[in-house]
UniProtKB/Swiss-Prot annotation:
Naturally occurring in which organism (per UniProt): Actinobacillus pleuropneumoniae serotype 7 (strain AP76)
Function per UniProt: Transfers the gamma-phosphate of ATP to the 4'-position of a tetraacyldisaccharide 1-phosphate intermediate (termed DS-1-P) to form tetraacyldisaccharide 1,4'-bis-phosphate (lipid IVA).
Catalytic activity: a lipid A disaccharide + ATP = a lipid IVA + ADP + H(+)
Keywords for this protein: ATP-binding, Kinase, Lipid A biosynthesis, Lipid biosynthesis, Lipid metabolism, Nucleotide-binding, Transferase
Claim: Metal-binding is one of the keywords in the record: no
Pathway: Glycolipid biosynthesis; lipid IV(A) biosynthesis; lipid IV(A) from (3R)-3-hydroxytetradecanoyl-[acyl-carrier-protein] and UDP-N-acetyl-alpha-D-glucosamine: step 6/6
Residues that coordinate or bind ATP: S53, V54, G55, G56, N57, G58, K59, T60
Name of the protein described by the UniProt record: Tetraacyldisaccharide 4'-kinase
Gene Ontology biological process: lipid A biosynthetic process; lipopolysaccharide core region biosynthetic process
Family assignment from sequence similarity: Belongs to the LpxK family.
Taxonomic path: Bacteria, Pseudomonadati, Pseudomonadota, Gammaproteobacteria, Pasteurellales
Length: 326
């Protein structure tokens, strides 16, 4: 939300509620740390990929990158997720390539389709972990989001920060977009900066598109084929302008853009009305998993891959591999 990027009269009106939010969260954290509230310790190490702010900071590309890197190094990894946006009431549940994004959420389906990783969804993280460990022999559990879910003990914490928006106006909810104060970053093992300029002790990540994929046929074409071409773009992610800016920076001529709420389900007529049949409709990979059943001929999604420097890659992975004895 733009109002969270600066201070205004609304900010100060909401500030007392932010103070209350912060106090409650601190009391809750204290109770977990003193073991007054129970928390679950997984039999295998747990790595959390999360953030301290609301909205899309790029956690899912980090999870995909991490899973792929670990798989290449022989680590048996599983992923757990809340399954935001899914309608299923059957928890815990394994997500497969045949799972519906409408039922289990768009991000879990995307992660499984990209990596083939064992993945379970549930609001109860313990149930998800137990389901995975009952069916797979795993070395490590990665949790997609859940930094503030202190009912689950963790061994490693990574935080993803939006390198452009950073921490907005610096207030916690509802006056600002923070779930926790930036001082929380002092306690995590890695800070990943998504775009912009990485600050000290942060690892810069860039999200790079290489090709576009047709939703109907699976045809791939270089993203450069769309340079100078008139297109329409949609994005149902935490921060839609990031996707639109990426396309425009590549040279795509966007006639129209439409942002949607994160995890929003799409109606076929809603999207068909946005672009004429001959105009390409570009979307994120996360949106595509919700649109395949009614996709039109000229609809394309643009997958992005997380990229790190060799130095950051080594710095991020070595502590994990050392802990696992790999």
């Amino acid at each position: 939300m733009n109002i969270w990027q600066s201070t205004s009269i609304i900010t100060w009106l909401l500030a007392p509620f932010s103070l209350l939010f912060w106090l409650v969260s601190q009391i809750r954290l204290f109770l977990f740390r003193k073991k007054i509230l129970k928390s679950y310790r997984s039999p295998v190490p747990v790595l959390v990929v999360g953030n301290i702010s609301v909205g899309g900071n790029g956690k899912t590309p980090v999870v995909v990158w991490l899973v792929e890197q670990l798989q290449q190094r022989g680590v048996k990894v599983g992923v757990i997720s809340r399954g935001y946006g899914g309608k299923s009431k059957d928890f815990p549940q394994l997500v497969t390539n045949q799972s519906s994004a409408e039922m289990v959420g768009d991000e879990p389906v995307l992660i499984v389709q990209r990596t083939g990783v064992p993945l379970a969804i549930s609001a109860n993280r313990q149930q998800s972990i137990e389901l995975l460990l009952n069916q797979f022999k795993l070395d490590l559990i990665v949790t997609d989001d859940g930094l503030q879910h202190y009912a689950l003990q963790r061994d490693i914490e990574w935080v993803v920060v939006d390198g452009i928006r950073r921490f907005g106006n610096g207030f916690v909810l509802p006056a600002g977009g923070l779930r926790e104060l930036p001082s929380r970053l002092q306690t995590v093992q890695a800070i990943i900066c998504n775009g912009g300029i990485a600050h000290q002790n942060e690892h810069l990540m860039t999200l790079e598109p290489e090709f576009a994929v047709n939703l109907r046929t699976g045809e791939q074409k270089p993203i450069t084929d769309f340079i100078g071409q008139e297109c329409v773009a949609i994005a149902g992610i935490g921060h839609p302008p990031r996707f639109f800016n990426m396309l425009e920076n590549l040279g795509v001529k966007l006639l129209k853009t439409q942002g949607f709420a994160d995890h929003q389900a799409f109606e076929p007529a809603q999207l068909k009305a946005l672009a004429a049949e001959q105009i390409p409709l570009l979307m994120t990979e996360k949106d595509a998993v919700k649109c395949r059943t009614f996709a039109q001929q000229n609809w394309w999604y643009v997958p992005v891959s997380a990229k790190f420097s060799p130095e950051s890659t080594a710095c991020l992975l070595e502590p994990i591999l050392k802990r696992l004895g790999k």
